[in-house]
Structure formats: C-alpha cells, structure tokens
C-alpha cells in the first residue's frame, strides 16, 4: 500500500511538472503564433490592396488609352481588339510565381480530365466568345464617347444576373431586381437620348452601330461570366487558382489567334504601317500606346484573378463594379466629354444599381460563411466544411 502511494505521489508530481512545462510551452507557442498570423494578415491585406489598385487603375487606364489610340489617328478595330488579348503570356508568369509560394499539391490536384477534347472545347468556346466581346467593345469605343461607352458597358452586371438565372439558378432577390432595373434604365437613357451627344466626329449610323456593339459586348461579357461559372462547376469540377488562371490564359490565347486571323483576313494589316507613320503623336507614342493598352489589360486581369484567390469571386466582382463609374469621370477630365443632365442622372442610377448589386452579394457571402461555420467542439466537421470554399490554392 505504501509502495502504491509512493508511486502515485511520484506520478502526481511528474504530472504537475509535465503540466507546468506544457503550460510554459503553450504560452510560448501562443506568443509566437499570435505574431505569425498577424504578420501573415498584414501581408494578405497588402496583396489585396495591390490587386484592388490593379483593377481600379488599369480598368480606367486601358479604356482611356484605347480612346487615345482612336483619337490620334488609330483606325484599326482589329488592332484595338488584339492589344486587349495579346498580353496573355503575363498570366502564365503570374501563375508560376504565385505557385512557388503555395504548398505542394496533393494527389487530388493532379486529377486527369476525362477527355482533353472537353478541355480543348472549353478553351475554344470561351475564346471565341472573348474575341467577339473584345471586337464589339473596340467598335463601340471607336464610335462612342468614352463616358457613354463605359456607362452602357456597365449593364454587364444586369446581363450577368440575367444569364446566371438560367445557367446557374441565380435567385432574383429584391436587390438584384432593383439592380437590373436601375442599370437597364441607366443604359436606356443614353440610348434614347442620342440627340444630346456631340456626334460631329461620327455619322448617325456609326453612332448607332457603336451603341449596338457596346450593348452586344455587355451582353457577351455577362454570358461569358455566367458560362465560366457553369464550366468550373459542372465541367472542370474544380475551382482552384491554377484552374481559373489557366482558363483565362488559354481562352485569351484562342481569342488572340482568332483576332489575328481577322486582322489579316480583313486586310487591315496592310494599313498599319501608314497608320503608325501618320499617328498624330508620332511613331514611338503609337507603339507605346498599344503596348500600354496590352499591359494594362493583363495587369487588370491579374488583379481580378488575384482578388478571387486572396478573397472571393464576389469581392472581385464587387471591386470591378465599383470601378466602372470611375471611367466616365476620367473621360470628362481627359477628353472633355459632354456631361449633360441625362448622363449625370445615368451615372447616379448606375452607382445606385452597383450598390444594390454589391450589397446582395455581400449578403450572399455572409450567409454562406454563416452556414459553413462548424459547431464548437466538433472538429470532425472542419474538413467537410472547408471543401465548400470556392477557390483553393494549388
């Protein structure tokens, strides 16, 4: 009995000693771990801030530079389309350097697609749609003032919600309906009120063509976004960072090839030399303008993909929506676009529609996070819940 008591006392002392040591170790680990996440959090928000700047700045810059090209003697719509796409190799570099800081992929990340034909078909279909959208937006930017062009193009949010209703079972909540209505009215005001615009530089027919092409580009962008969401969910069946980046890069590759064919088939390539020589700002500014457009579009794309990776697709879409009203304001300053009452009212309606659209997606994301929060004390639910996140690093 005494031996048993001695053993118990010794074990008790050992346990206390172990507990004391464990507490000290836990305290040390807590101090170290509290500083590590804080440091990582700063770095994450720094990256998010950089990506937000990329989206807002390059979205406006690429549109403004596109108009600068046309204002100073540029006439090739195919060239204006090509520079939107030809910088796609930058995306492969972005993907490579982003992957170097990610953990090693698991076996699930190396899943083979059932058919390379399916994957190729996805890139070709989306690439054709991208080329059509880019060409229509180039024609619209050629014939319309920048402020009018950007406001009409903002209706892409309404088209995105419309196509998502059919392709992705998007629910029409009061905020979405309000956004659809406001953005439609905003664009309609500019379409029906063409008499107030200064159309001295283009004929009435070309102005109408510009409006039709811009609306077509807006609808095409909405269809593309909804279709990509469907493809990632139903066809590719994984929404990883590398999958999204590859999809954007390869569809840009296909679109660039299509536009190059159009450039040579139309014969516009023959006029590029004389266009450069007669460019009002000179030959070097001509090349620099086109190069800057190509770079700014790809930096914008990097910002969009980066925001999806660091935050969510909802946040990325929201930042894109916030940036759209910036272009008309910049256009008034740079190109002295006429800002009449109807255009001001259109901007107000567009901003109201953006806020309604963004707020609904904020509610959706908040609801999604709430539903994915696991109960305290039940760690077995964590792996299953983590599997529901939209974008995973690869």
Curated annotation (Swiss-Prot):
GO biological process, one term: purine nucleobase transport
Amino acid composition bias (Basic and acidic residues), ranges on this chain: 383-394
InterPro entries: PUP_plant
Membrane topology, as annotated: Multi-pass membrane protein
Keyword annotations from UniProtKB, A to Z: Membrane, Transmembrane, Transmembrane helix, Transport
GO molecular-function terms, A-Z: purine nucleobase transmembrane transporter activity; purine nucleoside transmembrane transporter activity
Chain residue ranges for the region called Disordered: 373-394
Protein localization: Membrane
An example Gene Ontology CC term for this record: membrane
Pfam families, per the entry: PUNUT
Family: Belongs to the purine permeases (TC 2.A.7.14) family.
PANTHER family: OS09G0467300 PROTEIN-RELATED, PURINE PERMEASE 22-RELATED
Protein name (record): Probable purine permease 8
Species of origin: Arabidopsis thaliana (Mouse-ear cress)
């Amino acid at each position: 009995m005494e031996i048993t008591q001695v053993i118990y006392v010794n074990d008790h002392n050992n346990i206390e000693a172990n507990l004391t040591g464990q507490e000290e170790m836990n305290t040390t680990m807590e101090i170290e771990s509290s500083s590590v996440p804080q440091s990582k959090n700063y770095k994450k928000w720094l990256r998010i801030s950089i990506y937000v700047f990329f989206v807002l700045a390059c979205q406006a810059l690429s549109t403004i530079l596109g108009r600068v090209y046309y204002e100073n003697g540029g006439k090739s719509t195919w060239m204006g389309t090509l520079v939107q796409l030809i910088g796609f190799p930058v995306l492969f570099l972005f993907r490579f350097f982003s992957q170097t800081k990610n953990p090693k992929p698991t076996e699930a990340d190396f899943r083979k697609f059932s058919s390379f034909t399916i994957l190729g078909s996805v890139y070709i279909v989306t690439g054709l749609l991208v080329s059509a959208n880019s060409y229509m937006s180039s024609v619209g930017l050629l014939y319309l003032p920048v402020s009018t062009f950007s406001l009409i193009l903002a209706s892409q949010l309404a088209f995105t919600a419309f196509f998502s209703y059919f392709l992705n079972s998007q629910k029409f909540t009061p905020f979405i309906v309000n956004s659809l209505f406001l953005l439609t009215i905003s664009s309609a005001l500019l379409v029906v009120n063409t008499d107030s615009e200064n159309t001295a530089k283009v004929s009435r027919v070309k102005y109408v063509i510009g409006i039709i092409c811009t609306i077509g580009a807006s609808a095409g962008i909405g269809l593309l976004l909804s279709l990509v969401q469907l493809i990632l969910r139903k066809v590719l069946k994984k929404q990883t960072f590398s999958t999204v980046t590859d999809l954007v890069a390869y569809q840009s590759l296909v679109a660039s090839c299509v536009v190059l064919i159009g450039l040579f088939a139309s014969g516009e390539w023959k006029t590029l030399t004389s266009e450069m020589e007669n460019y009002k700002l000179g030959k070097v500014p001509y090349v620099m303008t086109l190069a800057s457009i190509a770079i700014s579009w790809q930096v914008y794309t990097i910002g969009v993909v980066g925001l999806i990776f660091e935050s969510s697709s909802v946040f990325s879409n929201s930042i894109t929506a916030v940036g759209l009203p910036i272009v008309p304001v910049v256009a008034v300053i740079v190109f002295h676009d006429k800002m009449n009452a109807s255009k001001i009212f259109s901007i107000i309606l567009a901003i109201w529609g953006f806020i309604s659209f963004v707020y609904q997606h904020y509610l959706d994301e908040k609801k999604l996070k709430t539903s994915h929060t696991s109960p305290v004390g039940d760690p077995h639910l964590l792996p299953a819940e983590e599997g529901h996140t939209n974008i995973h690093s690869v």
